[in-house]
Amino acid sequence: MNSSNLENFNYKSSIRDEVVPSRKRLTLPPWLEVAKPRLIPLLLATTLGGMALTEEWPLSSPKLICTLGGGALAAAAAGALNCLWEMELDKRMIRTSKRALPSGKLSSETVFLAAVSCTLAASMLLISGVNYLAAGLTLLGLCSYVILYTVILKPRTTKNIVFGGVAGAIPPLVGASAATGHVGLSGWWLFGLVMLWTPAHFWALAILLKDDYASVGIPMLPSVKGSLFTAKAISRYGLATVLMSIMGVFALPEGGLLYGIMLLPFNGRLLQLINKLKKSPDDLLRAKSLFRWSILYMFGICLLLLISRTQLSVEFEQQSMQIFFSIGSLLSN
């Protein structure tokens, strides 16, 4: 690698580290690194969101622990299997060449055994402590990430994250099924929201890393179509995400009014950052800002769903309706 390429790589790496600052401050042990623990909290948050959309919320502590524990173990297994499959690819990229598997810190046999063990443990925990549907959906999410996205779609099409995003959208279904034994329309709403949010979220990151992906032949949208095309696609999916998020007002069993009010600043900020990137699609700082906010956005949606199911939210909705009807009566007189 010549000096100019090395300088470009160092710049891109610094951008990536700034997007996820913990990468600078925290070095994970090899066995934890392959589990991709940074991805797990958001998966568990959307699982909780799926639970909050049901009449059975809140769940008993044992069922809640088993659901989240099983989900975390399955996500860790999926991350490890993803690292195994992409080990040779990671060796070819300086940014990833020092990871646990390509650097030889862990053997492929050890990682595979750990992934199988986590999968079995997740299955046992979910079957014994939750139900068969939650266990089956969790395994479906694992297989979707490893087989559908990593093996089939990622190396072949620019639409990889559009269809492969199903893996990240399954946790809400797991949460709903854990609570009720079935998914229900509200669970499917959150599934759809995550599906629409995922491309806009991931493509913002892919703009930062488009040269990395291009160097190893991975057809991410920014690498193939360019930043301008990608920014326009992000705009479309971002608008669809905002419209879908509003439907949560009707998806919630109660507390939809408070959810709708609190949702406004989240959607406003998301649209603002998307519009800024669309105006300057090659601005890495704008792509970074959008990527960061998109993560906070989904965490925020899930938090709003939980808040909306509290007694305070129910009382707020009741009082608001009383005021509304009182005003209506005064106007009619």
From Swiss-Prot:
Sequence intervals crossing the membrane = 64-84, 110-130, 133-153, 161-181, 189-209, 246-266, 287-307
> What function does the entry list?
Converts heme B (protoheme IX) to heme O by substitution of the vinyl group on carbon 2 of heme B porphyrin ring with a hydroxyethyl farnesyl side group.
| Gene3D superfamilies per record | UbiA prenyltransferase (1.10.357.140)
Q: Which domain of life is it from?
A: Bacteria
According to the UniProt record, one GO cellular component term is:
plasma membrane
Membership in a protein family: Belongs to the UbiA prenyltransferase family. Protoheme IX farnesyltransferase subfamily.
User: Which named protein is this?
Assistant: Protoheme IX farnesyltransferase
Task: Please give the organism.
Answer: Prochlorococcus marinus (strain MIT 9312)
Provide a GO biological process annotation.
heme O biosynthetic process
Q: In which pathway does it act?
A: Porphyrin-containing compound metabolism; heme O biosynthesis; heme O from protoheme: step 1/1
Q: Which InterPro entries match?
A: Protohaem_IX_farnesylTrfase, UbiA_prenyltransferase, UbiA_prenylTrfase_CS, UbiA_sf
Question: Which keywords appear in this protein's UniProt record, sorted alphabetically?
Answer: Cell inner membrane, Cell membrane, Heme biosynthesis, Membrane, Transferase, Transmembrane, Transmembrane helix
Gene name of the encoded protein: ctaB
Extra remark: Carbon 2 of the heme B porphyrin ring is defined according to the Fischer nomenclature.
Q: How does it sit in the membrane?
A: Multi-pass membrane protein
One Pfam family, short name? UbiA
The record's NCBIfam families line, in alphabetical order, gives:
cyoE_ctaB, PRK04375.1-2
- UniProt catalytic activity: heme b + (2E,6E)-farnesyl diphosphate + H2O = Fe(II)-heme o + diphosphate
